[in-house]
Regions:
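Vicinal oxygen chelate
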Residues: 1-16, 23-31, 65-70, 74-75, 91-113, 118-170
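N-terminal beta-strand motif that seeds the catalytic metal site of vicinal oxygen chelate
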Residues: 2-37, 99-106, 165-170
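A cross-kingdom feature marking solvent-exposed beta-strand/loop segments within repeated
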Residues: 12-13, 48-61, 83-94, 134-137, ...
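N-terminal strand-loop-strand beta-hairpin
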Residues: 3-5, 12-13, 22-28, 43-69
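Amphipathic alpha-helical segments
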Residues: 32-48, 116-124
Length: 170
């Protein structure tokens, strides 16, 4: 696809600012992931997803549905049980179907960039409510209270890059 606007490569320098990284993901949480997928299919044109699901570190369950549209990956998330608060706490309670923006996702390219992002977060006084190192990625959420959503940072491993490259493209 040819883009109408020239897009410069990301200036990856998280020490200078937490948004100065490769933005690649927009994520939403939902109370009903099947209904959210159907909404994305019928109203927004995203027809195919890659599913990733499993147990949360604290014992609950998480399910995500992922799809590329151009250079942005959309992620739908639903979680339940212990540890799901990070994902579900900002949704309205007891009102049936709901979906809300949860985070922007950023790729980092080196351990140096990862360490700079962690240090910058600490200097800002922001919290990192979740951090994990798994076979796909090293990942963390930064709570950016002024933005009203999280910033998620990935330091991908080859298996994670392979997985992301296999997500359906639209």
């Amino acid at each position: 696809m040819h883009y109408l606007l020239q897009r410069p490569a990301a200036s990856v320098d998280p020490d200078a600012g937490l948004l100065l990284a490769e933005h690649f993901q927009m994520a939403y949480v939902t109370t009903d992931i099947e209904r959210a997928c159907e909404l994305f299919r019928s109203r927004l044109g995203i027809r195919r997803f890659a599913r990733l699901e499993g147990q949360l570190v604290a014992g609950g369950h998480i399910r995500t549905e992922l799809a590329w549209v151009g250079s942005i990956m959309y992620e739908l998330i639903s979680a339940s049980g212990p540890g799901s608060e990070l994902y579900m706490a900002r949704l309205p309670q007891g009102q049936g179907f709901a979906m809300r923006h949860h985070h922007l996702g950023f790729l980092l390219q080196s351990r140096q960039q990862w360490d700079a992002m962690i240090a910058k977060t600490m200097r800002l006084g922001w919290s990192i409510p979740y951090r994990n190192d798994n076979p796909l990625v090293e990942v963390c959420f930064v709570d950016a209270p002024e933005l009203g959503h999280y910033l998620e940072y990935f330091l991908p491993k080859q298996a994670g890059l392979d997985f992301f490259n296999g997500v359906p493209r639209h």
